[in-house]
Amino acid sequence: MKIETSRFGLLDIDDDKIITLPDAMPGFAETRFTLLNPEKHAPFCWLQSVDNPDLAFVMVDARQTLPDYAVSLTSDEYERLSLDEKSNTVVFLVVTLATDPADITVNLQGPIVLNPERMIAKQIVLEGSRFPSRHPLFGIAKGRETVETSCAG
């Protein structure tokens, strides 16, 4: 399938790389995306809409960035993602970019959970969570070294 993107131009994407979000992300109608990982943008990857060339979200793989971060899914979320007890998931965090790396944050309240076997994803809204919506990505605020990450998918 050929898709037009405003950032990367015309791309040829295999049909099996299309991710479906049965429940669109809050505020967006698009439900079909693909994961792009241009090496020059590492550690970031892009969740690119296949239907809207201008809609893409910058993300990082949570387990590479914050290994202790965990998301508990409800039985309804398991069902919506077509998961069972043997299924693997990949949890992505949406990134808010900034000119100064110290100001780059990730949204821990709204992770995107992907079932890579079925290519189904869902943004999980962790209401009342102890997690912030703007957590420093590189831990500079806590004096940690810069974290090197990569997107899996």
Swiss-Prot record:
One of its GO terms (biological process) is regulation of translation. Pfam families: FliW. Its main location: cytoplasm. The keyword Glycoprotein does not apply. It is found in: Cytoplasm. Belongs to the FliW family. This is Flagellar assembly factor FliW. It comes from Geobacter metallireducens (strain ATCC 53774 / DSM 7210 / GS-15). The lineage of its organism: Bacteria, Pseudomonadati, Thermodesulfobacteriota, Desulfuromonadia, Geobacterales. The gene is fliW.
